UniProtKB/Swiss-Prot annotation:
CDD domains: AdSS (cd03108). Mg(2+) binds at residues 14, 41. One of its GO terms (cellular component) is cytoplasm. This is Adenylosuccinate synthetase. GTP binds at residues 13-19, 41-43, 306, 332-334, 415-417. Belongs to the adenylosuccinate synthetase family.
């Protein structure tokens, strides 16, 4: 039996993690975010009602679940307050269910200004960030000048630290990026206005998780973005600024790494990507348009149209290695309904003619990579909302089996629609 279960994306994000976390938290006592910030967009549909969460863990909708934002998350007070208000307006007592690590770095207005100034300066070479200040906040953390939630306990010292760091960043904004300076007093006033709310939710997260482990409580760790966006192992430099792989759980929450029991990789039945960067199986034809339309592939955070393509099992195998995956949850299988044939990328052809079955490590090595496909019959029957494996068309079952063969990982959960009820749990991670 697994008490500590990790749910993370195996592609470039947008795999459907939020729904699965919400579904599995029916048995969990805690749900923990351990990396990223409000650049995530987790969409839940419960009884037909849609909820989009960016910063707060997906377990917040469950009354018997405590949601935790761990130290690996960069926290925007403004974004958190906005999200809390939206949920509280719907009658959800967020402050009774949410806890924070005092080590969470804060995202403040100057981080957002820097993020957007840099993207503008890059021009055609822009990375395609969400413009929410995530990267600059992580930079401040690593440079040891960042302000953290715990700094809000001493407001006088916080004001002094803020003044110093803002002088540094405003110098960059004005003199290098030729942008406007960010107003110190406004940032201070805005942050002080919510300081007591934030500090009232602070706990020792590492200690709490260790006590939960000793009691045998079920804990769900909710990843954001996807494996191929990992700062170290992703398609650098077109990546996010945090460790999206399973290794980020220990560093971003304080749970000892030996205590992770099961890692569930969320795998979309096809591939998508937002923003710039390598995408070998990207489709520019009517099939790509079909996947975008049928899958409603528009970012929950940015509203940007996602790039679409066939499932890339070469890239997914890299995710298997990096995360030591225990099982997959296959999502959006129903989007492939109606296609006469479906394709799986099984290898890459490099510019020099070599065929490889692993992803390139250097950014430049992705250039000119061509996907090698295996083509399988599609299916005309609808899989939408099917709740039993026996109800799936044989061609869909063959597709599922082939994914398992190519990756070496079992598909333990199949999602056939956005609602939590439209799911087949073949093996529950908490029972594995």
């Amino acid at each position: 039996m697994g008490n500590n279960v990790v749910v993370l994306g195996t592609q470039w994000g947008d795999e459907g993690k939020g729904k699965i976390v919400d579904l599995l938290t029916e048995r969990a006592k805690y749900v923990v975010r351990y990396q990223g910030g409000h650049n995530a967009g987790h969409t839940l549909v419960i009884n037909g009602e849609k909820t989009v969460l960016h910063l707060i863990p997906s377990g917040i909708l469950r009354e018997n679940v405590t949601s935790i934002i761990g130290n690996g998350v960069v926290l925007s007070p403004a974004a958190l307050m906005k999200e809390m208000k939206e949920l509280e307006d719907r009658g959800i007592p967020v402050r009774e269910r949410l806890l924070l690590s005092e080590a969470c770095p804060l995202i403040l207005d100057y981080h957002v200004a820097l993020d957007n100034a840099r993207e503008k300066a890059r021009g055609a070479k822009a990375i395609g960030t969400t413009g929410r200040g995530i990267g600059p906040a992580y930079e401040d953390k690593v440079a040891r000048r960042g302000l953290r939630v715990g700094d809000l306990f001493d407001k006088e010292t916080f004001a002094e630290k803020l003044k110093e760091v803002m002088e540094y960043h405003n110098f960059q904004l004005v003199n290098y990026y030729k942008a406007e300076a960010v107003d110190y007093q406004k940032v201070l006033d805005d942050t002080m206005a919510v300081a007591d709310i934030l500090t009232s939710m602070v706990v020792d997260v590492s200690d709490l998780l260790d006590q939960a482990r000793q009691r045998g409580d079920f804990v769900m760790f909710e990843g954001a973005q996807g494996t191929l966006l990992d700062i170290d192992h992703g398609t650098y430099p077109y990546v996010t600024s945090s460790n999206t792989t399973a290794g980020g759980v220990a560093t971003g929450s304080g749970l000892g790494p030996r205590y992770v029991d099961y890692v569930l990789g969320i795998l979309k039945a096809y591939s998508t990507r937002v923003g710039a960067g390598p995408f070998p199986t990207e489709l520019f034809d009517e099939t790509g348009e079909f996947l975008c339309k049928q899958g409603n592939e528009y970012g929950a955070t940015t509203g940007r149209r996602r790039r679409t393509g066939w499932l890339d099992t070469v890239a997914v195998r890299r995710a298997v290695q990096l995360n030591s995956l225990s099982g997959f949850c296959l999502t959006k299988l129903d989007v492939l309904d109606g296609l006469k044939e479906v394709k799986l990328c099984v290898a890459y052809r490099m510019p020099d003619g070599r065929e490889v079955t692993t992803t390139p490590l250097a950014a430049d090595d992705w250039k000119g990579v061509e996907p090698i496909y295996e083509t399988m019959p599609g299916w005309s029957e609808s899989t939408f909302g099917v709740k039993d494996r026996s109800g799936l068309p044989q061609a869909a079952l063959n597709y599922i089996k082939r994914i398992e063969e190519l990756t070496g990982v079992p598909i333990d959960i199949i999602s056939t629609g956005p609602d939590r009820t439209e799911t087949m749990i073949l093996r529950d991670p908490f029972d594995a």
